[in-house]
Amino acid sequence: INFNVCCETSQGLSYARNRGIEEAKGDILVYVDDDATVNREYLSTIAQFFDRYPDAMAAGGAIYPVYETKEPKWMSKYTRELITAYKDEGRRVIRMTGSRFPSGGNAAYRREVFDRVGRFDPTLGRRGNLLISGEEKAIFYSMKKLDMPIYYLPSMILYHIIPQSKLTKQYFDNLTLSIGRS
């Protein structure tokens, strides 16, 4: 696998992702959050999946939090999903229908997706300390309007590193307010 590192001078997640689209030479584009690690077979799993599912236009996988400290007692299923992007849809490959989507921090797309639906909206997505979001959902919604299949791939595992600073009420309030603005 060939890797190319480039620098995007415009600050923001959507700008970086769009730069990746422009720079990439392959057919499959993979996006992983910068505060995460993946399982050893991550890229080979994705490559094999797209070979086996030629109809698939995008896929996302499981996301498990790795806390730098203990998970707080106040954490519920709902706060965990918001703060950590936790996702576990089971052990089978499934087509994500209706309002089900992968997380953008653990997603792979065929290049054709961006030729057909456009790029990530730079007015959305993380930018500096702003926690706005929704740029991936906009892409996924556009894909679903065109009936482009999106799958959940359980063996596409991402471990999301959660620092203590994200386990505070202040962070949670800022996050939910930002999501509401998005």
Which residues are covered by each model-predicted region?
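Acidic donor-binding segment of Leloir-type glycosyltransferases
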Residues: 1-7
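Glycine-rich, basic loop-to-helix element that forms the pyrophosphate-binding segment
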Residues: 8-24
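Short aromatic/hydrophobic "clamp" motif used to bind/position activated sugar donors
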Residues: 29
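The conserved acidic donor/metal-binding loop of glycosyltransferases
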Residues: 33-37
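Conserved donor NDP-sugar-binding/catalytic core segment of glycosyltransferases
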Residues: 41-75
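Short, flexible, basic/aromatic active-site loop/helix in glycosyltransferases
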Residues: 78-100
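A short, conserved alpha-helix in the catalytic core of glycosyltransferases
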Residues: 104-109, 113-118, 123-156
